[in-house]
UniProtKB/Swiss-Prot annotation:
Name of this chain's protein: Conotoxin Cl14.1b
Single annotated GO MF: toxin activity
UniProt propeptide residues: 20-47
UniProt tissue specificity: Expressed by the venom duct.
Keyword Signal attached: yes
Organism in which the protein naturally occurs: Californiconus californicus (California cone)
Leader peptide range in chain numbering: 1-19
GO terms under cellular component: extracellular region
């Protein structure tokens, strides 16, 4: 029972942790976008590297292009 509860808590908090890590890296400008796309590993990678132009929003950004 306790293991199951801990597993569920871990699953629920992982996207939040990832969002806060990215917020710390890029100064928080994309925090809202990252929270919305928390499950999209590709978007996270592009946000971390800073390849996206500022006018790209969310999932439209691929390899630095809209």
């Amino acid at each position: 029972m306790n293991v199951t509860v801990m597993f569920l808590v871990l699953l629920l908090t992982m996207p939040l942790t990832d969002g806060f890590n990215i917020r710390a890296i890029n100064g928080g400008e994309l925090f809202g976008l990252v929270q919305r796309d928390a499950g999209n590993a590709l978007d996270h990678g592009f946000y971390r590297r800073g390849d996206c132009p500022p006018w790209c929003v969310g999932a439209r950004c691929r390899a630095g292009k809209c």
